[in-house]
Swiss-Prot record:
InterPro entries: CyaY, Frataxin/CyaY, Frataxin/CyaY_sf, Frataxin_CS. Belongs to the frataxin family. PANTHER family: FRATAXIN (PTHR16821), FRATAXIN, MITOCHONDRIAL (PTHR16821:SF2). Transmembrane segments: none annotated. PROSITE patterns: FRATAXIN_1, FRATAXIN_2. One of its GO terms (biological process) is iron-sulfur cluster assembly. This is Iron-sulfur cluster assembly protein CyaY. The gene is cyaY. GO terms for cellular component: cytoplasm. The keyword Nucleotide-binding does not apply.
Length: 107
């Protein structure tokens, strides 16, 4: 398990990476980071929320498709419920919101 400061640094790097990938690829999303929450909003107002939950050292995604909790395991963020990869879930949510294929590369 990471220390709290390692977790915060890792999650901030991940949030920054997501924003950079969206900007570099020109996808139609607005990103806002405030506190522990990265809000990604599609052109039609659909939101995908990526949240850092420091006490459990988890990342959470909330989207129309549902809510997911991810814990770091061997360098990957995997869903606590079904071991789905963070990027797979995020890319599906972003693609559904935008109506086009979105693929955030792994950090």
């Amino acid at each position: 398990m990471m220390t709290e400061s390692e977790f915060i640094r890792a999650s901030e790097a991940l949030f920054e990476h997501i924003e950079d990938q969206i900007d570099e690829n020109g996808w139609d999303f607005d990103c806002r980071f405030a506190g522990n929450v990265l809000t990604i909003e599609a052109g039609d107002g659909t939101q995908i929320i990526v949240n850092r939950h420091t006490p459990n050292q988890e990342l959470w995604i909330a989207a129309k498709s549902g809510g997911y909790h991810f814990a770091e395991q061997n360098g990957k963020w995997l869903a606590t419920r079904d071991s789905r990869d963070f990027y797979d879930v995020l890319n599906e949510a972003l693609s559904a919101a935008s109506g086009e294929a979105v693929e955030i590369a792994e950090l």
